[in-house]
Swiss-Prot record:
A cellular component term, taken from the record's GO annotations: cytosol
Reactions mediated catalytically: oxaloacetate + acetyl-CoA + ADP + phosphate = citrate + ATP + CoA
This protein's name: ATP-citrate synthase alpha chain protein 3
The protein's Enzyme Commission number: 2.3.3.8
Molecular-function annotations in GO: ATP binding; ATP citrate synthase activity
GO biological process, one term: lipid metabolic process
Length: 423
């Protein structure tokens, strides 16, 4: 599962669109999205309610505590909303130690209310945890002892009996409505492959539940079966995270292939770089370098899997090598070309793309004093490893090559010893 945050606007859109289909509940919520490219005249034509109702406006940027941070404006008319957005659009703010400009807002009707409820659903290994409280709102953390929680195993349905412990202390006049709402939201959660959903708060409007603030995360590995249900969904980067040109290139490459190609720069001046096959193996290599005390020297996180073809691997390896060899400073560097024992991936085929990239970057590798450590197993691995050994002699670049007879992470210690030998 890959949990990806989505904007509040999309969380509410998905809930509104699918709650009726799955639970016969009409959710009368309205919302509009505002960005730098928004034409307010056109927006009002699409959403006429904006000009006739009192409004709420707030950033929709994947960070919380907006109310406590003074970033939520209430009971405004449209002109005031436009002014609020104008004063803050593109302005850098700091949240949770991360700084970034505000680029996206959500605008909604202002809903006066007295009671605030809390609801969250979290997907876990064996089921889902559903939490509910009658004391929702910005002080939910201070009132966490009042939150009721049930765990629902994956194979169990959210029946009225399963929901009953959450709503047992509610007044009778709202208990049934809120119980039906919780079960309906859970149906949407399951059907659309949410991994996390939170409403803090939701309230009651004319006797019907109404989400005021909402967060959602989707399992993006389920996109293949949900693309019609999700519609034009976006998975924004976490607040404060901006892709470098190299990362953007790999991200676009990843979007165009059925394979997985991931690349994140952690420390451009790091001296240990990775190009690892397999999602699990890539994490193990990074963790091992960190556990050995050299996380500060780790230049990147990189992973390729799903049997990418030679051309895709070539383009991928070019980017990794360009970053790994940038700005040589006379000190040794190390590149880990690692992986476990593949089940289906032709090791020789993927290594062919890497070898082509290594040949292209020969002068950069030498200038950066790069030492390369290879460990891999799987179909046709002997041929792939033999090609790597031959390449080392051909280029005059130090390449140490190991097969499945060696431990998977042994090359991490060798890489560290290499870069620290001169210290």
């Amino acid at each position: 599962m890959a949990r990806k945050k989505i904007r509040e606007y999309d969380s509410k859109r998905l809930l509104r669109e699918h709650l009726k289909r799955l639970a016969a509940i009409d959710l009368h919520i309205l919302s509009a999205q505002v960005t730098e490219s928004t034409d307010f005249t056109e927006l009002v034509n699409q959403e006429p309610w904006l000009s006739s109702m009192k409004l709420v406006v707030k950033p929709d940027m994947l960070f919380g505590k907006r109310g406590k941070s003074g970033l939520v404006a209430l009971n405004l008319d449209l002109a005031q909303v436009r002014q609020f957005v104008k004063e803050r659009l593109g302005v850098e703010v700091e949240m949770g130690g991360c700084k970034a400009p505000i680029t996206t807002f959500i605008v909604e009707p202002f809903v006066p209310h007295d009671q605030e409820y809390y609801l969250s659903i979290v997907s876990e290994r064996l089921g889902s945890t559903i939490s509910f409280s009658e004391c929702g709102g910005i002080e939910i953390e201070e009132n966490w002892d009042k939150v009721k929680t049930v765990f629902l195993p994956t194979e169990k349905a959210m029946t009225p009996d399963a929901c009953a412990p959450l709503i047992a202390t509610l007044p009778l006049e709202v208990r049934t409505k809120i119980g039906d709402f919780i079960r309906g939201v859970y149906s949407v959660f399951q059907d659309l492959d949410f991994s996390f959903l939170e409403m803090n708060p939701f309230t009651m409007v004319n006797g019907e539940p109404y989400p005021l603030d909402m967060r959602g995360e989707l399992d993006d590995t389920a996109a293949f079966k949900n693309f019609k249900k999700w519609g034009n969904i976006q998975f924004p980067l976490p607040f404060g995270r901006v892709l470098s040109p190299s990362e953007s290139f790999i991200h676009e490459l990843d979007e165009k292939t059925s394979s997985s190609l991931k690349f994140t720069v952690l420390n451009p001046k790091g001296r240990i770089w990775t190009m690892v096959a397999g999602g699990g193996a890539s994490v193990i290599y990074a963790d091992t370098v960190g556990d050995l005390g050299y996380a500060s020297e780790l230049g990147n996180y990189a992973e390729y899997s799903g049997a990418p073809n030679e051309e895709e691997v070539l383009q991928y390896a070019r980017v990794v090598l360009d970053c790994a060899t940038a700005d040589p400073d006379g000190r040794k560097r190390a590149l880990l070309i690692g992986g476990g024992i593949a089940n289906f991936t032709d090791v020789a085929a993927t290594f062919s793309g890497i070898i082509r990239a290594l040949r292209e970057k020969e002068s950069k590798l030498k200038a950066a004093r790069m030492n390369i450590y290879v460990r891999r197993g799987g179909p046709n691995y002997q041929t792939g490893l033999a090609k790597m050994r031959t390449l080392g002699a051909e280029l005059g670049v130090p390449i140490e090559v190991y097969g499945p007879e060696a431990t998977m992470t042994g090359i991490c210690k060798q890489a560290i010893d290499c870069i620290m030998a001169e210290a």
